[in-house]
Amino acid sequence: MTTTRYRPTWDLALDPLVSCKLCLGEYPVEQMTTIAQCQCIFCTLCLKQYVELLIKEGLETAISCPDAACPKQGHLQENEIECMVAAEIMQRYKKLQFEREVLFDPCRTWCPASTCQAVCQLQDVGLQTPQPVQCKACRMEFCSTCKASWHPGQGCPETMPITFLPGETSAAFKMEEDDAPIKRCPKCKVYIERDEGCAQMMCKNCKHAFCWYCLESLDDDFLLIHYDKGPCRNKLGHSRASVIWHRTQVVGIFAGFGLLLLVASPFLLLATPFVLCCKCKCSKGDDDPLPT
């Protein structure tokens, strides 16, 4: 005869809760997900939103643990990602992963024809000079270095083409076309497509910030002064009020940091002699001969 041990109902409320490092909420273990590589644990909802955001924005292909202080610097495996996102998001993740593999593979390159987008194989990987590459899909023959139509006996142009329009090959690239929907990053030359939004662009590959219209660097232009003058004036794509609010926030951050430094400077001046005195005493104690 088997007996079942009775468990009081009030014991159910004493089940341990686990804290999520993302939302700081406490949840039962059943609502948590553990990353296999580093054993960090988060609530399933937060981890799912984190993974979906990175994939939708195309920020990362190797999705790292959300904990910045993770001792093992773990990453989510593909099967873990597949269990928590929808099929279309997983398809986008695999596409981004493949694009990154081709980008860093010296044996492969993309066909520059905007209507093709096939992956082409380089014949001689060890060859340092430009070589002809023929796309097996559209049969276009192009240069492995500048991606223009193959030019035997001629060097590559000094200025690499940076924009092109849909339906055109790299031989018909536009150099100063403001309305071109696809351009190259001025720094790493990766193709970037802009559907809509503001003209301040950031390359997802090298994190370089630049103006979409003139390709000038915006890495140090925190206040977006570039759009107050010149040919790109008022082309940012945001209202004047939002630009003023952005500048107010940036100035506030710098002013707050300066104020903090100003308040802390007297304490630093007072503490400096004390620190120097302690160091002198320590060095003097090390130099004293040992008693015999």
From Swiss-Prot:
Annotated positions binding Zn(2+) 4: 185, 188, 203, 206
Matches recorded under SUPFAM superfamilies: RING/U-box
PROSITE patterns found in the cross-reference section: TRIAD (PS51873), ZF_RING_1 (PS00518), ZF_RING_2 (PS50089)
Binding-site positions, Zn(2+) 1: 20, 23, 43, 46
PTMs per UniProt: Auto-ubiquitinated.
Variant or mutagenesis effect after changing residue 252 to D: Preserves membrane localization but is defective ubiquitin ligase activity
Keywords: Cell membrane, Cytoplasmic vesicle, Endoplasmic reticulum, Endosome, Membrane, Metal-binding, Repeat, Transferase, Transmembrane, Transmembrane helix, Ubl conjugation, Ubl conjugation pathway, Zinc, Zinc-finger
Biological process terms in GO annotation: pattern recognition receptor signaling pathway; protein K6-linked ubiquitination; protein ubiquitination; ubiquitin-dependent protein catabolic process
Main subcellular location of this protein, as a coarse class: membrane
Residue positions binding Zn(2+) 5: 211, 214, 226, 232
Catalytic reaction equation(s): [E2 ubiquitin-conjugating enzyme]-S-ubiquitinyl-L-cysteine + [acceptor protein]-L-lysine = [E2 ubiquitin-conjugating enzyme]-L-cysteine + [acceptor protein]-N(6)-ubiquitinyl-L-lysine
Chain sites annotated for binding Zn(2+) 2: 111, 116, 135, 138
PANTHER family: RBR FAMILY RING FINGER AND IBR DOMAIN-CONTAINING
Protein's recorded name: E3 ubiquitin-protein ligase RNF144A
